[in-house]
């Protein structure tokens, strides 16, 4: 796992390390030299090379001055400019035009707001540098807590951050400004990080293998979704769950006609009580609850619509279902902000809202700090929350959180969220712990998009790509670019 520390947590780690006896100037020397080594490597050497370093106040600027000194020791011609003394823009522009590398040491991870004055000018001017642009800890202009950018920000080709990743380097648009991120160990005592970016090995170890004597009912999944004209959603969920390892999937949809449309060769469809309009009716809750204990997981919501009777059925299912539950889409909307049914549950729950569903459920916008938003809802609901969108956050409250870095904008198409719910359901059916089922589900979802290809991607492509994506996860193989 790659630990992630917020700026506040990093400040505490710095103080803890200094209090334990490591002087701040020693930490600064290590940090600056780590930056200098990165610049040297990316320039391809030092002979005849030129570099520009722009420094701000505080530790970030100090790291930049150490990097400049180290580069000079190695024979690089270095031009240093400081924000505190004022940047001679004419001289700086000339230096940038002939530079082989640029070092951004203006602002660190504690930055908030917008760059102005010389800092904003430098952020725009560095595009003239043909060689590497290396940011110290984080590109100047990027909010270290959220990744937000307000106005100008440095576009780095490389970022050397210290001891742990920062949220602003993982969330967009900050991640897009950071380029290739190198984490340099400078001897900071990180304590016990609660946020991390999971890697292949972490996730593979958390996915249970099927026992030699297993049978299909040991890993069964029950899917409840669909309404008139929306039968594709539960079908996507069902087939994704099977591809992710469910031994048998029943797909409950309202009415005989909907059941016929949602059917598939491998998936067993069941017609549930429906209203005259083809929506799930309240008596359906009794049928679902009667069958639920035969299954290892229940996935509820995709395509259900927003009929009041459907919402009543969903609320009862949520409160009374005795098995792990994945609640998505209209299943979340059915709660209408009432978290009581979730808190009443005796079995684990995974919620998978996008930003709009989050508002409906939590009664507030996600805001810029996605990490804090996911953790708040997880604590209030007593559930694992997977907050969808760029930089997916998986949280189970204050205990731990993961940030998924696979996938991309090509997944923003109809039905892909249904596939994600199905993957999580399949992993839960295999016996994965809910937090890890959600984290591995998000990771696999993104990898499936890489297998399927990005341009023109549709939800069905993801399902076809799941076996290869899951196989690469279980075998610890990196996908070829």
What does each of the following model-derived ranges do?
Residues 90, 94-97, 372, 376:
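Polar/charged alpha-helical tracts
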Residues 84-94, 113, 204-209:
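Glycine-rich oxoanion-binding loops at beta->alpha junctions
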Residues 1-82, 101, 156-158, 169-325, ...:
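Small-residue (G/A/S/T)-rich helix-start motifs and N-terminal tracts that mark the onset
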Residues 85-88, 140-144, 167, 331-334:
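Short acidic loop-to-helix transition motifs that present clustered carboxylates
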Residues 100-101, 106-196:
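Internal gly/pro-rich beta-alpha loop/helix module
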């Amino acid at each position: 796992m790659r630990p992630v520390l917020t700026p506040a947590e990093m400040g505490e780690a710095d103080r803890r390390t200094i209090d334990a006896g490591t002087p701040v100037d020693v930490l600064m020397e290590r940090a600056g030299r780590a930056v200098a080594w990165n610049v040297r490597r990316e320039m391809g050497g030092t002979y005849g090379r030129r570099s520009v370093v722009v420094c701000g106040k505080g530790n970030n600027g100090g790291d930049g001055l150490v990097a400049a000194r180290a580069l000079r020791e190695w024979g690089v011609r270095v031009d240093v400019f400081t924000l505190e003394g004022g940047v001679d823009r004419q001289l700086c522009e000339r230096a940038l035009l002939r530079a082989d590398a640029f070092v951004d040491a203006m602002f660190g991870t504690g930055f908030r707001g917008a760059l102005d004055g010389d800092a904003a000018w430098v952020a725009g001017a560095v595009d003239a540098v043909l060689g590497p642009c290396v940011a110290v800890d984080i590109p100047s202009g990027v909010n270290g807590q959220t990744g937000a950018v307000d106005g100008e920000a440095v576009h780095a080709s490389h970022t050397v951050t210290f001891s742990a990743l920062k949220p602003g380097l993982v969330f967009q648009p900050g991640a897009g400004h950071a380029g290739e991120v190198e984490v340099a160990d400078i001897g900071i005592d990180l304590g016990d990080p609660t946020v991390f970016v999971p890697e292949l090995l972490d996730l593979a170890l958390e996915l249970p293998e099927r026992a030699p004597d297993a049978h299909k009912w040991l890993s069964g999944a029950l899917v409840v979704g669909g309404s008139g004209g929306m039968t594709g959603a539960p079908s996507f969920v069902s087939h994704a769950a099977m591809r992710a390892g469910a031994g048998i999937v029943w797909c409950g949809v309202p009415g005989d006609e909907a059941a016929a449309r949602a059917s598939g060769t491998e998936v067993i469809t069941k017609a549930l009580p429906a209203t005259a309009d083809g929506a799930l009716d309240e008596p359906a809750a009794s049928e679902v609850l009667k069958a639920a204990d035969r299954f290892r997981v229940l996935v509820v919501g995709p395509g259900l619509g927003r009929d009041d009777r459907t919402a009543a059925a969903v609320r009862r299912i949520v409160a009374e279902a005795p098995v792990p539950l994945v609640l998505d889409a209209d299943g979340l909307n059915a709660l209408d902000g009432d978290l009581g049914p979730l808190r009443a549950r005796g079995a684990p729950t995974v919620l998978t809202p996008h930003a709009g569903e989050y508002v409906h459920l939590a009664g507030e916008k996600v805001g810029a700090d996605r990490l804090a938003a996911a953790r708040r809802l997880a604590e209030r609901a007593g559930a694992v929350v997977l907050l969808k969108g760029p930089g997916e956050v998986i949280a189970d409250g204050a205990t731990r959180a993961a940030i998924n870095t696979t996938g991309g904008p090509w997944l923003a198409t109809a039905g892909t969220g249904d596939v994600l719910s199905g993957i999580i359901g399949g992993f839960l059916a295999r016996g994965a712990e809910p937090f890890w089922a959600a984290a591995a589900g998000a990771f696999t979802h993104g990898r499936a998009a890489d297998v399927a290809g990005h341009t023109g991607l549709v939800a069905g492509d993801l399902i076809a790509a799941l076996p290869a994506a899951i196989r690469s996860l279980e075998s610890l193989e990196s996908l070829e670019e």
